[in-house]
From Swiss-Prot:
Tissue expression profile of the protein: Expressed by the venom gland.
PROSITE patterns named among the record's database cross-references: LCN_CSAB
Keywords: Amidation, Disulfide bond, Ion channel impairing toxin, Neurotoxin, Secreted, Toxin, Voltage-gated sodium channel impairing toxin
Localisation per UniProt entry: Secreted
Source organism per UniProt: Leiurus hebraeus (Hebrew deathstalker scorpion)
SMART domains: Knot1
Lineage: Eukaryota, Metazoa, Ecdysozoa, Arthropoda, Chelicerata
InterPro entries: LCN-type_CS_alpha_beta_dom, Scorpion_toxin-like, Scorpion_toxin-like_sf, Scorpion_toxinL, Scorpion_toxinL/defensin
Name of the protein this chain belongs to: Alpha-like toxin Lqh3
PTM sites of type Serine amide: 67
Domain comment as written in the entry: Has the structural arrangement of an alpha-helix connected to antiparallel beta-sheets by disulfide bonds (CS-alpha/beta).
GO cellular component terms, A-Z: extracellular region
Span of domain LCN-type CS-alpha/beta: 2-66
Length: 67
């Protein structure tokens, strides 16, 4: 397990609103313990997850979003 900004298949972040429960819900659905809306340089507001399973993608540094 690991912590990180949860990624969509194209190495794109899940955008969010500070203070909303959306990231916590998303992270728990994906097997993490919790989540919150954070700020990722180069991506903007993005969901951060705690204790995600290894089979759930997180943002790869240096890779662009390929949407």
């Amino acid at each position: 397990v690991r912590d990180g900004y949860i990624a969509q298949p194209e190495n794109c972040v899940y955008h969010c609103f500070p203070g909303s429960s959306g990231c916590d819900t998303l992270c728990k659905e994906k097997g993490g313990t919790s989540g919150h809306c954070g700020f990722k340089v180069g991506h903007g507001l993005a969901c951060w997850c705690n204790a995600l399973p290894d089979n759930v993608g997180i943002i790869v540094e240096g890779e662009k979003c390929h949407s």
